[in-house]
Amino acid sequence: MKSLLRQIPQISKVVEIFKKKYPEIYVVKAAREVAEKYRKEIIEGKRKDLNGFLEDVERKIKSLMKPNIKRVINATGVVINTNLGRAPLSKDVINFISEIANGYSNLEYNLEEGKRGSRIAHIEKYLNELTGAESSFVVNNNAGAVFLVLNTLAEGKEVIISRGELVEIGGSFRIPDIMKKSGAILREVGTTNKTKVSDYEGAINQNTALLMKVHKSNFYMEGFVEEVKLEDLVKLGHKYGIPTYYDAGSGLLINLKEFGISVDEPNFRDCISLGIDLVSGSGDKLLGGPQAGIIVGKKNLIEKIKKNPIARALRIDKLTLSGLEMTLKLYFEKRYEDIPVIRMLTQDEKALRQKAKRLEKLLKDIPGLKISVIKDKAKPGGGSLPELELPTYCVAIRHDRLSSQELSRRLRLAEPPIVCRIREDQLLFDMRTVFHEDLKTIKKTLQELLSI
């Protein structure tokens, strides 16, 4: 054993072998990790020789050199998959981001006047037009938007909100926690399942700064329930001269019912038309753009928010801003089909079945696979439209040698990774979230994995 341990190549010698081919920092790290692995296996009696040492080092080098964030093929059927990066961006958006990233830009420069300008001005006209708001502002995400609104308008003062709307918005971030950090004082009213206008009104006092509602975007309640309507909250706010604020969550810019999706999901324009003073939402959920926190509403309130020093800490960067501008431009031009999230949500069953049949045909010649096309249900995801199930078609496969769990694992570790779902020991590729251009990649990946 000692003799074999002494034969493990020195790190410096391994570096000499690979230094012309790979950056030294990766070679050193890979050589050390592989040497340690071999040393441990020899001591434990699991290894009797050093065969394959250099090959293992080179494989490790290549693995270390790959970026950690990878493009993933989403075959889960969850359209706004938070773990997989939420909304995929339009090709127009991607090209525009690339163009802006590839040099300098007029991010904060007024070309007409030749002096400093505002970065938000680039998208404000789109947001105001699309939502009907007097003014608008954008920060890095919607949790930041909620924090900024509360800190600006209610620091040291009370914010009245329904107990049933004190939601957790994911990643253990909870509305009460954000409110506490903002300096606002939580005044919860009503019960978990029932809150009335009288509950809000009964809690109003001289220290009340804001009447707030939060859209329950990631769950829904039914049965013996009641919540305060936005229009009633507006009337109450007007009666006492207190601003109203609605966290709409998903950032919807259109009426989904016009696209055949029968859900009562609030969109920015409808909320503003009801008279809510401020509305906020996410950029990378139902809106289908990059991550951002969008705030629209009354100009006097937005101006206060813009002047808050914390706004700079939550500032949106130029690439996100570029992506958001182009996404909003697509909405402005009514090019909804070019927005991937909207396109995926509104795909008809016939198109999904055709896509499934095409993948089935591509996979039929791969040995050992049992393939079928099945009808199933997909989900919007991203903490949006929790009650909605979308009809979809899946290609279901089962291998005669590998379990579905093992095949799923191998697909996740492939290049590019492919993430599916498993049901009844079948691997399902949901066509609602698989792009046409990914079908041949799925075939090629399965061929390579199953030929090993």
Swiss-Prot record:
InterPro entries registered for this protein in UniProt: PyrdxlP-dep_Trfase, PyrdxlP-dep_Trfase_major, SelA-like, SelA_trans
Q: Please state the span of the N-terminal signal peptide per the UniProt entry.
A: none
The record, for Pfam families, names: SelA
Q: Which GO terms describe its molecular function?
A: identical protein binding; L-seryl-tRNA(Sec) selenium transferase activity
Q: Which UniProt keywords apply?
A: Cytoplasm, Protein biosynthesis, Pyridoxal phosphate, Selenium, Transferase
Gene3D superfamilies assigned: 3.90.1150.180, Type I PLP-dependent aspartate aminotransferase-like (Major domain) (3.40.640.10)
In this UniProt entry, the residues modified to N6-(pyridoxal phosphate)lysine are 285
Q: Which reaction does it catalyse?
A: L-seryl-tRNA(Sec) + selenophosphate + H(+) = L-selenocysteinyl-tRNA(Sec) + phosphate
EC number in record: 2.9.1.1
Q: Which GO terms describe its cellular component?
A: cytoplasm
- Give the record's GO biological process terms: conversion of seryl-tRNAsec to selenocys-tRNAsec; selenocysteine incorporation
Q: Identify which cofactors the protein needs according to its UniProt entry.
A: pyridoxal 5'-phosphate
Q: Where in the cell is it found?
A: Cytoplasm
Q: What is its main location?
A: cytoplasm
Pathway note = Aminoacyl-tRNA biosynthesis; selenocysteinyl-tRNA(Sec) biosynthesis; selenocysteinyl-tRNA(Sec) from L-seryl-tRNA(Sec) (bacterial route): step 1/1
User: What does this chain do?
Assistant: Converts seryl-tRNA(Sec) to selenocysteinyl-tRNA(Sec) required for selenoprotein biosynthesis.
- Family named by the database record: Belongs to the SelA family.
Name this polypeptide is given = L-seryl-tRNA(Sec) selenium transferase
